[in-house]
């Protein structure tokens, strides 16, 4: 029998906690036998004194096991359970293509996603733009769609990882969100509760990233790779660029449209293609579907070119309550804003840098994102045709199209976009889409 205050004292004194102590404390978070003050105190002690890898693994697995852990064995699936998680960005629409692409290659992708907050867009918000699509189906329907389509992208259900829900809300109120140990456990407990065989982790770097510096992003990527593999799930982290909007757009309905254009081959943004392929190829290799990156990319290009990935996306949409002809006719179903107009730069030259976070906040200003949890969204608004770094900017070439509902919102977004996209005299050096891979063998 342990005492919560003794566990807090130990961590306050920078000592390592045992697996049993961590399990006891997490059980207390879940069943309310540990108070809010005690949770806040442990969070602060961890923030200042950190946790070693064994502690991080124990915290992650204890939180994972605080609720239901999905088990797919009874479905007799003939492929690996694989998934991807992103730390979030602007125009990060990867999940919408990656899930169907991985499923088309023989994987099963039960993707449990989140909503957007602050400048980052949420995958679930994009699906909420599709009429009828259920982001919170019951367990039976979720399993049915995973089995039949190979992929289902839904929201976190109440019985998954209850410890994280309580711990995170307290961390949020007590300034202990930015601990690498606690971020690692929060992300991975939710992902690993989906019963995964393998995970590709997308850790963003740059002006639109969650972590403030490249070094912090790399530290998080290393922590996630070490802890996930230590918890028994094959995992690789990719450090990817978020110094500009990833897709050509940012918003909800507009990103769904870009995902369909990507899957059907109508238009594939080259940067979006590179990051999607990098993550998806890693999933196939970790899951044993491909033995080399070249082989994985060949498989992925094949399912894009033969239409199988697009077909699976359509099957998932209709399976979860959306229209049966959504891929063929997205324009019939996706909402459109009243005002769609270009914004021009006030000078000519080249797009040299972007404050990607500010572009994400411009979407929030338009009504397409949340300032606080629970805010209602306008799914039609956002930015499209956003210029890329290195693009030549002239007086008659828009730097973006703004989709707004009112003139006031348009004017505010126009100011924000102009301020966020910096124009200079010379073309900047091209930055890589993927900075590096961190695999278990690299640790």
Swiss-Prot record:
Per its UniProt record, what Gene3D superfamilies does this chain match?
A: Nucleoside phosphorylase/phosphoribosyltransferase catalytic domain, Pyrimidine nucleoside phosphorylase-like, C-terminal domain, Transferase, Pyrimidine Nucleoside Phosphorylase, Chain C
Q: According to its UniProt record, what is one Pfam family this protein matches?
A: PYNP_C
| GO process annotations (BP) | pyrimidine nucleobase metabolic process; thymidine metabolic process
Query: What does the record give as the reaction this protein catalyses?
Result: thymidine + phosphate = 2-deoxy-alpha-D-ribose 1-phosphate + thymine
- What are the EC numbers? 2.4.2.4
Q: Which GO terms describe its cellular component?
A: cytosol
UniProt key word Transferase: yes
Annotated GO molecular function terms are: 1,4-alpha-oligoglucan phosphorylase activity; thymidine phosphorylase activity
Pathway of action: Pyrimidine metabolism; dTMP biosynthesis via salvage pathway; dTMP from thymine: step 1/2
**Function recorded in the entry:** The enzymes which catalyze the reversible phosphorolysis of pyrimidine nucleosides are involved in the degradation of these compounds and in their utilization as carbon and energy sources, or in the rescue of pyrimidine bases for nucleotide synthesis.
UniProt similarity note: Belongs to the thymidine/pyrimidine-nucleoside phosphorylase family.
Against NCBIfam families, the record matches this protein to:
PRK05820.1, T_phosphoryl, Y_phosphoryl
Query: Could you identify this protein by its name?
Result: Thymidine phosphorylase
Species of origin: Shewanella woodyi (strain ATCC 51908 / MS32)
């Amino acid at each position: 029998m342990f005492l919560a205050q003794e566990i807090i004292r130990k961590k306050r004194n920078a000592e390592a906690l045992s697996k049993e102590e961590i399990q006891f404390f997490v059980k207390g978070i879940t069943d309310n036998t540990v108070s809010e003050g005690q949770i806040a105190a442990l969070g602060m002690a961890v923030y200042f004194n950190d946790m070693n890898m064994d502690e991080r693994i124990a915290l992650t697995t204890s939180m994972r096991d605080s609720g239901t852990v999905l088990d797919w064995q009874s479905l007799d699936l003939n492929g690996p359970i694989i998934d991807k998680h992103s730390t979030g960005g602007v125009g990060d629409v990867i999940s919408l293509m990656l899930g169907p692409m991985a499923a088309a290659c023989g994987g099963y992708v039960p993707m449990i996603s989140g909503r957007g907050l602050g400048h980052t867009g949420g995958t679930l918000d994009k699906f909420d733009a599709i009429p009828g699509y259920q982001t919170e189906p019951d367990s039976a329907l979720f399993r049915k769609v995973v089995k039949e389509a190979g992929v289902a992208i839904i929201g976190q259900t109440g019985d998954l990882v209850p410890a994280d829900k309580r711990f995170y809300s307290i961390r949020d109120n007590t300034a202990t969100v930015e601990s690498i140990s606690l971020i690692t456990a929060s992300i991975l407990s939710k992902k690993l509760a989906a019963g995964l065989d393998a995970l590709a982790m997308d850790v963003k770097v740059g002006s639109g990233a969650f972590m403030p510096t490249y070094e912090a992003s790399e530290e998080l990527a290393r922590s996630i790779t070490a802890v996930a593999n230590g918890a028994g799930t094959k995992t690789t982290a990719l450090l990817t660029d978020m110094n500009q909007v990833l897709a050509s757009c940012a918003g909800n309905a507009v990103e769904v449209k870009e995902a369909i254009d990507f899957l059907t081959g109508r238009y594939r943004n080259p940067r979006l293609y590179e990051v999607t392929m990098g993550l998806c190829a890693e999933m196939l290799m970790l899951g044993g579907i491909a033995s080399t990156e070249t082989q994985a990319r060949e498989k992925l290009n094949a399912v894009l070119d033969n239409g199988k990935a697009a077909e699976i996306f359509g099957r998932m949409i209709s399976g979860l309550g959306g229209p049966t002809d959504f891929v063929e006719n997205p324009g019939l179903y996706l909402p459109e804003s009243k005002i769609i107009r270009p914004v021009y730069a006030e000078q000519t030259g080249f797009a040299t840098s972007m404050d990607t976070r500010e572009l994400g906040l411009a979407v929030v200003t338009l009504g397409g994102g949340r300032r606080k949890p629970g805010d209602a969204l306008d799914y039609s608004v956002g930015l499209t045709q956003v210029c890329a770094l290195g693009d030549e900017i002239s007086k008659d070439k828009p730097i973006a199209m703004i989709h707004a509902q009112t003139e006031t919102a348009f004017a505010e977004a126009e100011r924000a976009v102009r301020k966020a996209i910096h124009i200079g005299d010379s073309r900047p050096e091209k930055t890589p889409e993927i900075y590096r891979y961190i695999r278990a063998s690299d640790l």
